[in-house]
Swiss-Prot record:
L-aspartate binds at E167, R211, S360, R364. Disulfide bonds: none annotated. GO terms for biological process: aspartyl-tRNA aminoacylation. It holds the Pfam family tRNA_anti-codon. Homodimer. This is Aspartate--tRNA(Asp/Asn) ligase. The lineage of its organism: Archaea, Methanobacteriati, Methanobacteriota, Stenosarchaea group, Halobacteria. It comes from Haloarcula marismortui (strain ATCC 43049 / DSM 3752 / JCM 8966 / VKM B-1809). InterPro entries: Aa-tRNA-synt_II (IPR004364), aa-tRNA-synth_II (IPR006195), aa-tRNA-synth_II/BPL/LPL (IPR045864), Asp-tRNA_synthase_2 (IPR004523), Asp/Asn-tRNA-synth_IIb (IPR002312), NA-bd_OB-fold (IPR012340), NA-bd_OB_tRNA (IPR004365).
Length: 434
């Protein structure tokens, strides 16, 4: 719109045209106020009925809430107005009239259940606190990309339609691909490993992953955003260092650039970036800490994966971001390298928030014979992954990396109760639309 001024830029003494949504109308008799909202904030429009044209007043005060309008008028200081200024209108143009029966209240005065909000996401995003989540999400992704560039990474984009799953199993969405069986990719893992064997060496990707998991919990999605890193000539400890850098950079970017959004969420006083090195516990140390609390029905033993309850217990004990290292080889994927001095212990690691797992990573097996053996030990057919395995015959360097759940990072960063709040249009077992 030509000559439009954002509400945040409206300066006393100027004549401006502002445009946005009708947030609220308050009619006090001889005087009335319309609050107009755009992406930068809100501004008060004052109607003095006895001093204004009747048609102008009628247009401004009879419009439905959430209609899109433009207002042209003089900006004046008004300390009692929500933003300290107000517009005295010369003209009001109704651009798009809203239905009076709204499925939810964007002003937030009437709460709506999450399913209703997700069914009407466009309206839901008109609320300051919801919009703030996605503005913060955008800043997180910007900061993460910048952190990867500081690590001299090249951004890549890998296929999302594949012939075989990354890790086998049944957590795959099958599709028909020109008469062939194909799947939506559950991870860029194998492709990013191939890239570190190329001339690129150190890469990252931010993109969607698809997992046909049966889980239907506040922390699981069937389509999610994965933040992936892989580097040649890195071991698992260097990969953990990179992980710390990226996560801390995400927090620092939000702290520096999203104060208004944090205020909208009521987090301006408590939000802080994690400082220093994240504690690194071995898997065995983690089991000991969990078992020492006595909070589980049965003590954990070597080879057990950590349940949600176990993660919660350990998170309460540690109280900050931390790593779990040296996992049993038997419960880590085939591409994770074992320690040279103990083939029962892998170089795999998880990075945890006190409330849940955020990252899974490790050093990768770069030796062809050992890689094929790992396939066979986990009941997978190496020939089904020939495009991947054959490249390990042509000089594959030692390498390490990890994958970070983007929505989980946002969820834990902002203390959201449900991971679906961190996704514009979530995909889970019950939701395929909108």
């Amino acid at each position: 719109m030509e000559n439009r001024t954002y509400t945040a830029d409206a300066t006393p003494g100027d004549t401006v045209t502002v445009a946005g949504w009708v947030h609220e109308i308050r009619d006090l008799g001889g005087i009335a106020f319309l609050i107009l909202r755009d992406t930068t904030g809100k501004i008060q429009v004052k109607f003095e009925k006895d001093e204004m044209d009747d048609d102008l007043v009628e247009t401004g005060l009879n419009v439905q809430r959430e209609s899109v309008i433009s207002v042209t008028g003089a900006v004046e200081e008004e300390p009692r107005a929500p933003t300290g200024v107000e517009v005295t209108p010369e003209s009001v143009d109704v651009i798009s009239e809203a239905d009076p029966e709204l499925p939810l209240d964007p002003s937030g005065k009437v709460d709506a259940e999450l399913p209703t909000r997700l069914d009407n996401r466009t309206l839901d995003l008109r609320k300051d606190e919801v919009k703030a989540i996605f503005e913060i999400r955008a800043e997180v992704l910007r900061s993460v990309r910048e952190a990867f560039r500081e690590l001299n990474c090249t951004e890549i984009n890998t296929p999302k339609i594949v012939a075989t799953g990354t890790e086998g199993g049944t957590e795959l969405f099958p599709i028909t691909y020109f008469g062939q069986e194909a799947f939506m990719n559950q991870s860029p893992q194998l492709f990013k490993q191939l890239m570190v064997g190329s001339g690129l060496e150190r890469v990252f990707e931010i993109g969607p992953i698809f997992r046909a998991e049966e889980h239907n919990t506040p922390r699981h999605l069937n389509e999610a955003t994965s933040i992936d890193f892989e580097s040649a000539f890195y071991d698992h400890t260097e990969a953990m260092d990179a992980c710390e850098h990226v996560v801390q950079s995400a927090y620092e970017g939000v702290a520096e650039n999203c104060q208004d959004q944090l205020e909208a969420l009521g987090l301006e006083d408590e939000f802080a970036a994690p400082e220093g090195d994240f504690p690194r516990l071995t898997y065995e140390e983690a089991l000991d800490k969990i078992n020492a609390t006595g909070e589980l029905d049965e003590p954990l033993v070597w080879g057990d994966d950590l349940s949600t309850e176990a993660e919660h217990v350990l998170g309460q004990e540690v109280g900050e971001h931390y790593f779990i290292t040296d996992w049993p080889s038997e419960i880590k994927p085939f591409y994770i390298k074992d320690h040279d001095d103990d083939e029962e212990v892998s170089t795999g690691f998880d990075m945890m928030h006190p409330s849940m797992e955020l990252v899974s990573g490790g050093q990768r097996e770069h030796r062809f014979d050992h890689l094929v053996e790992g396939f066979e030990q986990q009941g997978l057919d190496p020939e089904a992954f020939e495009y991947y395995t054959k490249m390990f015959k042509y000089g594959m360097p030692p390498h390490a990396g990890w994958g970070l759940g983007g929505e989980r990072l946002i969820m834990t960063m902002l203390g959201l109760e449900n991971i679906r709040e961190a996704v514009l249009f979530p995909r889970d077992r019950q939701r395929l639309s909108p």
